[in-house]
Amino acid sequence: MKGSIFTLFLFSVLLAISEVRSKESVRLCGLEYIRTVIYICASSRWRRHLEGIPQAQQAETGNSFQLPHKREFSEENPAQNLPKVDASGEDRLWGGQMPTEELWKSKKHSVMSRQDLQTLCCTDGCSMTDLSALC
C-alpha cells in the first residue's frame, strides 16, 4: 500500500516537473525557429532604439527612414570609388579591415554555436532566454 502511494506521488511530481519544463522551453524547428528569433531580436532592438530617443524626437521622426551614409562617392574622380588594395594585392574594406573571408574565420565559433542551438531547439526545446542570446 505504501509503495503504491509513493509511486503515485513520485509519478505526479515527475509529471509536474515535465509540465514546468515544457512551459520554460519550446521546441522550434525550421521556419518557426527563424521567425521566433527574428521576432525576439527585432522587438528588443526596437525597444532599445526607442529608449535612446527622447519622446519629442520620436513624435517628430514618425515613419521616416534614413539610410546611413557609409561612404561618399565622387563623380568627378571615379578612381576614388574603387576599393583600396594594399601592397600584397589584397582588398581592404573602408575601415582597413580584411574582406569577409577573414571575418568568417573569426566568427566560425559563434556560427557553430548558433547551429548547435538551432539543433537543440528542434530536438529538446529551448527557452526564450536562450533565443534572445542570439541577438
UniProtKB/Swiss-Prot annotation:
Any GO MF annotation of the entry: hormone activity
Membrane-traversing stretches: none
Signal peptide: 1-22
Main location: secreted
Biological processes, Gene Ontology terms: positive regulation of feeding behavior
One GO cellular component, as annotated: extracellular region
Keywords annotated in UniProt: Cleavage on pair of basic residues, Disulfide bond, Hormone, Secreted, Signal
Domain of life per record: Eukaryota
Localization per record: Secreted
Propeptide: 49-114
Cysteine-cysteine disulfides: 29-122, 41-135, 121-126
Assembly and interaction partners: Heterodimer of a B chain and an A chain linked by two disulfide bonds.
Similarity field: Belongs to the insulin family.
Function: May have a role in gut contractility or in thymic development and regulation. Activates RXFP4 with high potency and appears to be the endogenous ligand for this receptor.
Annotated protein name in UniProt: Insulin-like peptide INSL5
Taxonomy of the source species: Eukaryota, Metazoa, Chordata, Craniata, Vertebrata
